[in-house]
A protein has these predicted regions:
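N-terminal propeptides/leader regions of secreted preproproteins
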Residues: 1-32, 36
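Loop/turn elements at helix/coil->beta-strand transitions in domains of secreted/extracellular proteins
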Residues: 61-66, 99, 133-136, 156-157
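Short, surface-exposed glycine/acidic/tryptophan-bearing loops
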Residues: 74-115, 128-130
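Disulfide-stabilized extracellular recognition modules
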Residues: 111-164
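A short alpha-helix/helix-coil micro-patch that ends at or immediately precedes a cysteine
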Residues: 24-87
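Secreted/periplasmic proteins
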Residues: 45, 51-54, 99-108, 114, ...
Length: 164
C-alpha cells in the first residue's frame, strides 16, 4: 500500500514529468515499494475505447461535422501506442507514426473525462474537430496494481489516432 487514495495517486502521477513517472512505475512494478509485494498487470478496456469514439463523434456533431468512421486497421496501432505510453509518455512511437494526428492522455478514469480534457486543450480539440481526418481509432490500456494487502489501484492510458 502506498498510503494514498486513488484520487491522490492520480493527482501525483499527473504532476510527474515523463521521466519521473517512468522511474516511479518501474519502482512499483519491480517491487521497490516498502512491502516489496506489488503485482502489476494490464488489460485493454474496449468498452471505454468505444465510449471515447462515441463521445468524439458527439462532439463533432455538436460542431456541425460529420462522424468519424472507425479505422480497424489503425486500431492495433492505437493499442500498441497505449501500451507504449506506459513507459514513454510522448508522441514518439517505436514503430513510426502513420496517423495524421494523435491524442494521448494518462490518468483520466472515464471516457467522458478524457474527451472533456481533450476538448479543453487547443491541440487535442483541433484533432477531434479536424476537417482533414475522416477516420479514428481509440485504445484504453489499464494498468492494475495489486498490493500485498489485497488493495488495488488502476492507471488508465488513452490513445486516439486520426487519419484519412
Amino acid at each position: 500500500n502506498l498510503g494514498m487514495t486513488d484520487d491522490e495517486m492520480v493527482a501525483m502521477l499527473q504532476s510527474m514529468t515523463p521521466d519521473e513517472m517512468d522511474a516511479f512505475l518501474n519502482s512499483v512494478a519491480y517491487g521497490s515499494t516498502t512491502d516489496n509485494n506489488v503485482q502489476v498487470s494490464g488489460y485493454y478496456d474496449n468498452n471505454m475505447a468505444q465510449e471515447v469514439f462515441n463521445l468524439t463523434n458527439q462532439e463533432r456533431a455538436n460542431n456541425g461535422l460529420s462522424a468519424y468512421s472507425w479505422d480497424s486497421n489503425m486500431a492495433s496501432y492505437s493499442d500498441r501506442r497505449a501500451k507504449e505510453i506506459v513507459k514513454d509518455y510522448s508522441h514518439n512511437s517505436v514503430g513510426g507514426n502513420w496517423s495524421v494526428g494523435e491524442n494521448i492522455a494518462e490518468g483520466e478514469t472515464s471516457a467522458s473525462e478524457v474527451v472533456n480534457d481533450w476538448m479543453n486543450s487547443a491541440g487535442h480539440k483541433a484533432n477531434i474537430l479536424s476537417d482533414v481526418s475522416t477516420k479514428t481509432s481509440v485504445s484504453c490500456y489499464v494498468e492494475k496494481f495489486t498490493y500485498a494487502d489485497g488493495s488495488t489501484q488502476y492507471l488508465y492510458h488513452w490513445v486516439q489516432n486520426f487519419t484519412h
